[in-house]
């Protein structure tokens, strides 16, 4: 586990309350992975984190996926999802508006106009 999340070794025995948001997310992911799950459920794993931490978590999740763990996540960060996920679903008001590969979703004109326009 420490190989995937070396930051956990650095924080050692620190109490969870003393950890940064990114360290807490990594700790939560690490704890979940210790059970050798077949399925990992994540709710907003990139929320409120610095871009470097988000990139690190994306890399960890890619490695976890390569190891055969299925990952189901909900997140608003499309760049993060594109790095981690094979497929995606766009939800609006609790209903699926679009589903497909991440490339298909990112190329969809309605998604770009509605959710990615600045």
Regions inferred by a protein language model and the residue ranges of each:
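Conserved ABC ATPase signature
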Residues: 15-19, 23
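ABC ATPase C-loop
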Residues: 32-33
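H-loop/switch region of ABC-family ATPase nucleotide-binding domains
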Residues: 75-76
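Catalytic Walker B motif of ABC-type/P-loop ATPase nucleotide-binding domains
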Residues: 40-44
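A short, surface-exposed alpha-helical micro-motif characterized by mixed small hydrophobic
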Residues: 81-83
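Helical segment within the ABC ATPase nucleotide-binding domain
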Residues: 55-67
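Conserved catalytic motifs of ABC-family nucleotide-binding domains
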Residues: 36
